[in-house]
Amino acid sequence: MQFIDQAEIQVEAGKGGDGMVAFRREKFVPAGGPAGGNGGRGGSVVLVAVANLQTLLDFKFQRVFKAENGKRGGPKNMTGAGGSDRLIEVPPGTMIYDRETEELLGDLVKPGQTCCVAQGGKGGLGNKHFLSNSNRAPEYALPGLDGEVRMLRLELKLLAEVGIIGLPNAGKSTLIAALSAARPKIADYPFTTLVPNLGVVRKPTGDGTVFADIPGLIEGASAGLGLGHEFLRHIERTRLLLHLVDITDVDPVENFETIQNELEVYGRSLEDKRQVLALNKVDAVDVKGAEIQELVNRFREISGGKVFLISAVAGIGLEELMQEIWGLLEMEEEVKSSELTPTPPLVSREES
């Protein structure tokens, strides 16, 4: 399936139904008063987040969405039927912007959340509303109002708990394939991954955590070079970053610092996210050699934390790495829970 994370669409709410001109005509009331009903309200356009969607691909083929118009008012003061709303399904994580004003209209994070993006027009008033002392038989009614028309920009940010970042060819796709049932395209050359890949990694308890293989970032990504902005955007919602560095590269330390700099320059608190550092492809080097040991110590000094030596291909060190990630996620969950739990009020002995 092709991954599309941005789209532009036009939404048109329904027009309100026209009010009706009608008069009461019954057997013993040959000249009754006005009885024209109001027009029905036009349908609105509503976006709804649906769990089984992961891309905005559908909007590549359909870009205009219209709600139903309201029906005309009827005789005997009957209000016309309202137009049906138009529901547009989007994946969770979709942000909705007005294309002209760039106003954020909605951020649909959870399945079932909705956002009304275009209100249907009000129905026109029937002639019963224009009865007055000077006009006992008004022969006019109001037309329904037009519904809202908007151009929208949809932007999808992946809802992954762990984002795997690193330069191209660091082994991110291989790692997510080793940890989950995801099968991303893998090859031994840079930029194999051109779109984010999602994989669900299972804990020993059976619970799943969504990992996102973010396509390889390059120097200048924060300024939009390559597909930098598109890729960095997907990191914003993650709870934890797994920074993967190719230990066999010419200068792994420089590669690490390049990515850290891009996160800092891009801003939006990306540089403050908790990170786990893993040096990949250790099956291709002598991990006990002095050169590698010196490199690992250097990384410990720079990152100020643990450094994991892994091989996504050979499965080396993956269990220890995952234990660290599970522990950090659980710790964060506990902190969040404690912040949400209200502190019970103190009761003095006199009050008790």
Swiss-Prot record:
<dbReference type="InterPro" id="IPR031167">
    <property type="entry name" value="G_OBG"/>
</dbReference>
<protein>
    <recommendedName>
        <fullName>GTPase Obg</fullName>
        <ecNumber>3.6.5.-</ecNumber>
    </recommendedName>
</protein>
<feature type="domain" description="OBG-type G">
    <location>
        <begin position="160"/>
        <end position="330"/>
    </location>
</feature>
<feature type="binding site">
    <location>
        <position position="173"/>
    </location>
    <ligand>
        <name>Mg(2+)</name>
    </ligand>
</feature>
<feature type="binding site">
    <location>
        <begin position="213"/>
        <end position="216"/>
    </location>
    <ligand>
        <name>GTP</name>
    </ligand>
</feature>
<keyword id="KW-0479">Metal-binding</keyword>
<dbReference type="GO" id="GO:0005737">
    <property type="term" value="C:cytoplasm"/>
</dbReference>
<dbReference type="GO" id="GO:0042254">
    <property type="term" value="P:ribosome biogenesis"/>
</dbReference>
<keyword id="KW-0378">Hydrolase</keyword>
<feature type="domain" description="Obg">
    <location>
        <begin position="1"/>
        <end position="159"/>
    </location>
</feature>
<feature type="binding site">
    <location>
        <begin position="311"/>
        <end position="313"/>
    </location>
    <ligand>
        <name>GTP</name>
    </ligand>
</feature>
<feature type="binding site">
    <location>
        <begin position="191"/>
        <end position="195"/>
    </location>
    <ligand>
        <name>GTP</name>
    </ligand>
</feature>
<keyword id="KW-0342">GTP-binding</keyword>
<keyword id="KW-0963">Cytoplasm</keyword>
<dbReference type="Pfam" id="PF01018">
    <property type="entry name" value="GTP1_OBG"/>
</dbReference>
<dbReference type="InterPro" id="IPR014100">
    <property type="entry name" value="GTP-bd_Obg/CgtA"/>
</dbReference>
<dbReference type="GO" id="GO:0000287">
    <property type="term" value="F:magnesium ion binding"/>
</dbReference>
<comment type="similarity">
    <text>Belongs to the TRAFAC class OBG-HflX-like GTPase superfamily. OBG GTPase family.</text>
</comment>
<dbReference type="InterPro" id="IPR045086">
    <property type="entry name" value="OBG_GTPase"/>
</dbReference>
<dbReference type="Pfam" id="PF01926">
    <property type="entry name" value="MMR_HSR1"/>
</dbReference>
<feature type="binding site">
    <location>
        <position position="193"/>
    </location>
    <ligand>
        <name>Mg(2+)</name>
    </ligand>
</feature>
<dbReference type="InterPro" id="IPR006073">
    <property type="entry name" value="GTP-bd"/>
</dbReference>
<dbReference type="InterPro" id="IPR006169">
    <property type="entry name" value="GTP1_OBG_dom"/>
</dbReference>
<feature type="binding site">
    <location>
        <begin position="166"/>
        <end position="173"/>
    </location>
    <ligand>
        <name>GTP</name>
    </ligand>
</feature>
<keyword id="KW-0460">Magnesium</keyword>
<comment type="subunit">
    <text>Monomer.</text>
</comment>
<dbReference type="GO" id="GO:0005525">
    <property type="term" value="F:GTP binding"/>
</dbReference>
<keyword id="KW-0547">Nucleotide-binding</keyword>
<dbReference type="GO" id="GO:0003924">
    <property type="term" value="F:GTPase activity"/>
</dbReference>
<dbReference type="InterPro" id="IPR036726">
    <property type="entry name" value="GTP1_OBG_dom_sf"/>
</dbReference>
<comment type="function">
    <text>An essential GTPase which binds GTP, GDP and possibly (p)ppGpp with moderate affinity, with high nucleotide exchange rates and a fairly low GTP hydrolysis rate. Plays a role in control of the cell cycle, stress response, ribosome biogenesis and in those bacteria that undergo differentiation, in morphogenesis control.</text>
</comment>
<dbReference type="InterPro" id="IPR006074">
    <property type="entry name" value="GTP1-OBG_CS"/>
</dbReference>
<dbReference type="InterPro" id="IPR027417">
    <property type="entry name" value="P-loop_NTPase"/>
</dbReference>
<feature type="binding site">
    <location>
        <begin position="280"/>
        <end position="283"/>
    </location>
    <ligand>
        <name>GTP</name>
    </ligand>
</feature>
